[in-house]
Amino acid sequence: FKEFDRIGVPASCTINAKTAIERRAIVDAANDRGWEILAHNYEQGELLTDFSGDIDRERNVILKTLDVYKKTLKRSAKGWLSSSLRGTLNTCDLLTENGLLFYCDMMNDDQPYLVKTKNGPIVSIPYSNEINDFTLLTRRGHTTSEFLDIIKEELDVLLMRYRMCVHL
């Protein structure tokens, strides 16, 4: 939090419902700063793909998660990132059914795009697993200092690409 405060940049983060309940100080600190906090399943180990054949069970996980989110943050979730990026073919429909605006599980593009659902469109905001904390710190064994350097480099690349885009 300190580095984001120092440079004055708002951030977004994902928090699963169980963490929101058990680690309230983290949620409060992010919420007090006005960060966008994405709903991230009820608990990390519970994958929506475990319920891919049972839409009601998947819906219940999403509803339970969104309920905790609203109670702890005092606002409705706008976006969703499934644990381990494991949504199902029903996830987008279930999210729009509950008023969510964006979904971050899809990694097939590096630009946001609209996804049609039964309840209207939802924005797919791309997720890069290449700069994921778990990937870099656990799977690849980088130190936290190396992780910070990688994130800074990624931001530099994104800024360069942004400057090359046509803005309407």
In which residue ranges do the predicted regions lie?
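Positively charged, amphipathic and often flexible ligand-engagement surfaces
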Residues: 124-146
